[in-house]
């Protein structure tokens, strides 16, 4: 059975997403992707360009060790949600994430959905044309 400290998860998903490996560590355990993100302030809106609706299609279940992140649901009447240090959260697909300050976040995500998202981010970061 896999066991790891968040900071010891493989960088960039063990080489699957090398460009994203700077602040993202993850491993696939069964049908979940266990991810650990460390980032400064970041509005992820531009990262979702090319995805359906310009929003993240992956649901996220997480815990905030440090910092604060907001989840915005563009084009809906859903209210903005905020998760701060010590909070657990669930953000369904169809969102945009905004990290308001330096943050450390652990997430458990459906592996198939996260792989699609991370592959998109890698293509975007490399300058390749994102796939729909």
Per-region residue spans from a language model:
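A short, N-terminal "cap"/entry segment at the start of jelly-roll beta-barrel domains
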Residues: 1-53, 130-132
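Residues that act as N-cap/strand-start positions at coil-to-secondary-structure junctions
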Residues: 19-21, 55-56, 83, 91
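A short, polar/proline- and glycine-enriched secondary-structure boundary/capping micro-motif
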Residues: 46-48, 81-84, 116-120
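Short, conserved beta-strand element in jelly-roll/cupin
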Residues: 54-71
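A generic structural motif
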Residues: 70-74, 98
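Short acidic-glycine-tyrosine-enriched beta hairpin
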Residues: 75-94
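Ligand-binding loop in jelly-roll beta-barrel domains
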Residues: 92-118
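Glycine- and charge-enriched low-complexity intrinsically disordered segments
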Residues: 121-132
